[in-house]
A protein has these predicted regions:
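A structural motif
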Residues: 63-81
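Catalytic alpha-helical scaffold of carbohydrate-active enzymes acting on polysaccharides/glycoconjugates
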Residues: 1-27, 32-69, 94-117
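Surface-exposed cleft-lining segments at the edges of enzyme active sites
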Residues: 24-25, 80-91, 119-122
């Protein structure tokens, strides 16, 4: 999508959430990948954090947009595995999530780590 379409998409989503919930969101997580314009457009729209980043497990400040915190999102701990793979059970997902947490907890002794759990409403 071009910049104008993306700006409209962000503003429409923001207004929809504000209308439905009574207040506007301060963070952005979209099912779409971001473009080279997304973070700037989010800052323009008043957002404080952006979660469409899959590059790591430590939040960071975007050097081009220092008013925006980038909060990584880990796809591997998303429960979508349950509906993408018929043989994947909730217990298997929970074990994977616990193992991931334990690994990041150990690694966190040396440097900060963060873990996200994506839980979908089925």
């Amino acid at each position: 999508m071009d910049e104008k379409e993306e700006r409209e998409f962000i503003l429409n989503a923001t207004n929809s959430i504000k209308t439905t919930c009574g207040r506007r969101p301060v963070g952005w997580l979209s099912r779409y990948l971001h473009t080279e314009n997304t973070r700037r457009l989010l800052v323009e729209a008043g957002y404080k954090y952006h979660m469409d980043d899959y590059s790591g497990d430590v939040p960071f400040i975007d050097s081009e947009h220092p008013e925006l915190v980038v909060v990584p999102y880990q796809l591997d701990t998303n429960d979508m595995k349950l509906w993408l793979n018929a043989g994947y059970t909730p217990d298997m997902w929970l074990k994977y999530a616990k193992d991931t947490f334990e690994t990041l907890y150990r690694e966190g002794e040396q440097s900060p780590k963060m873990m996200s759990l994506g839980c979908l409403l089925y």
